[in-house]
């Protein structure tokens, strides 16, 4: 496959939430944990900061990544969705992941991950984790995709958990009250791990 064919495979062969909606959502962490085991837990090779919330998590992720980079750290950044280019999702010091890395990752490991039947998000998340390990980042900013407690990214043990503003979103998955939605997003909070939370007046 070339790069364009690789993207076509990712978009058309794996369930993508933006294309097929809720049928792409895989509740639980089993797939993520299976992928993580196969790749030998790449996220343990650098520090991580986990960011959840309804509004502001993307801008917070980019701002924090830029601040850490200016302080001299080599910084990975994983966000979603992308606006134009798939590679916007995975960056190191502001530079997008290379097309060759995307191609090699998908083709090299295809026989291992296809039996797991990962979603688009689960596989691209693991691509990011492995890329950050391969490029020896000091710290990676990891933005939650959906919710928090059962989000694919919630296999990491971060040095800091951040929850930005919370409002109604993805109610079919997270619940129909702010309290239920907040509880799902608070699922990224780990015992004895520092956290930062933005106050939501309705709660």
Give the location of each predicted region.
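Short functional linear segments
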Residues: 1-52, 60-62, 66-71
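ATP-dependent carboxylate-amine ligase catalytic core
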Residues: 22-29, 34-44, 70-156, 172-182
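Hydrophobic/aromatic beta-strand patches that form the interior of the parallel beta-sheet core
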Residues: 49, 76-78, 160-162, 196
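Catalytic cores of secreted/periplasmic lytic hydrolases that degrade extracellular macromolecules
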Residues: 57
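Inter-motif core of Ras-like GTPase G domains
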Residues: 154-165
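Membrane-proximal helix-turn-helix segments that form the acceptor-binding/catalytic region
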Residues: 182-190
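Short loop-to-beta-strand entry elements in the cores of soluble alpha/beta enzymes
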Residues: 190-197
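Residue-level detector of conserved catalytic or cofactor/ligand-binding positions
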Residues: 198-203
